[in-house]
Amino acid sequence: MEEFQGYLELDKSRQHDFLYPLIFQEYIYALAHDHGLNRSILLENVGYDNKSSSLIVKRLITRMYQQNHLIISVNDSNQNPFLGHNKNLYSQMISEGFAVIVEIPFSLRSVSSLEGKEIVQSHNLRSIHSIFPFLEDKFLHLNYVSDILIPHPIHLEILVQTLRYWVKDASSLHLLRFFFYEYYNWNSLITPKKSISIFSKRNQRLFLFLYNSHVCEYESIFLFFRNQSSYLRSTSSGALLERIYFYGKIKHLVEVFVNDFQAILWLFKDPFMHYVRYQGKSILASKGTPLLMNKWKYYLVNFWQCHFYVWSQPGRIYINQLSNHSFDFLGYLSSVGLNPSVVRSQMLENSFIIDNAIKKFDIIVPIIPLIGSLAKAKFCNVLGHPISKPARADSSDSDIIDRFVRICRNLSHYHSGSSKKKSLYRIKYILRLSCARTLARKHKSTVRAFLKRLGSGLLEEFLTEEEQVLSLIFPKASSTSRRLYRGRIWYFDIISINDLANHE
């Protein structure tokens, strides 16, 4: 945000209402370039395309309007020299610059809304790991959980309409519509998952912004009723961005609920309801009954379809009992189990045996999906047997080792909260042996001979920082160090999920 505030010496009206001129500013694409180089990628930093530059983008946008492409049909795009073989490259450049521009007013207003509030180290709340201590504390007292697949908008115009409530610059919105129309023929995007996925992969930053703004729109209303009913002040509600007709929509929904759905208003009065969203899924957990959870399910379906024009089905919401169900959450397999304990009590000549069952929030790493991700990345086969990476054979030995070590440490860092470390040991073994096979293949040697020549140096490279510190404090692998390493550790510096840890 310091970069935004340093570059943008504009008054409030220009910041909020006239974003379009920023498209032709040099520093916008410098910011997009820096974001591409400095973003947190847990695998490998692929860098930025050398063909991308602010000058090319400016000439491109100018040519778009000079050639009057607004009247050119999508069917003629194949003959259009502007939309030739570099169509994907142009699309990437425009989307990155536009994403930076539309994020600026949101980021500035979010920072200003947090100023003056007593939020200690609010940047730690950005970490993915910050949600797990919350789950450990809350889910032990709940009974049911709903796994919800958030529906995609049936048309990209819905995303633009949602953005219209927040961004008041008509020129920027017209450019966004034109961009979708020219590059993706959005008339055909009636929820085909393939088309949406292609769009999101090519223009990930822009798509995530539009999608999150759409989800935040319905969540703001959903959480508004939830917070009003429980009379609890939500810290995050102060950071909600103003939107046109927001309170009119709230008033309309209240009238609908009061007049037509009086029987379901008590849904909002459950004080033990917790909602968590991540990626394209969300979790709704409650201490209520199965009847209550089913009413929530059908309410959400109608809420999405009637007020936000997204197609959803009750089958996309799965209700399970926490005591006998494990749910996939951000690369972890989470469950609430019973930890039995027996207490012997003696009173005079009589003795009693008391069985106590204490709930425990268990988090483990699902080994099968993770091995599948490693197999897809060519580190092993589908059975988990390590294989060499021919693509790395042309690199230097130190570069090969550094790449494998970085991936191994990032996976260990992300999965440090696992209750059982056995799965991590197996993943480290696969990566370590895959590295050895790659080096042996490069030197035309056997793995045994190469490891014998290298000694224990390769093994030490794969030790994480935690293991290195513990080995210095507690030498000879004492029971204390083993007990500390087996414990769950959550970090507040993880702001993106590892691609290998994402089993979607």
Swiss-Prot record:
First-listed, main subcellular location of the protein, grouped into a coarse class: plastid
Subcellular localization(s) per the UniProt record: Plastid, Chloroplast
InterPro entries, per the entry: Domain_X, Maturase_MatK, Maturase_MatK_N
Domain of life where this protein originates: Eukaryota
Any one Gene Ontology BP term: mRNA processing
GO molecular function annotation: RNA binding
One Pfam family linked to the record: Intron_maturas2
GO-annotated cellular components: chloroplast
Keyword DNA-binding tagged: no
Keywords: Chloroplast, mRNA processing, Plastid, RNA-binding, tRNA processing
HAMAP family: MatK
Biological role stated in the UniProt entry: Usually encoded in the trnK tRNA gene intron. Probably assists in splicing its own and other chloroplast group II introns.
Protein family: Belongs to the intron maturase 2 family. MatK subfamily.
UniProt name for this protein: Maturase K
Designated gene of the protein: matK
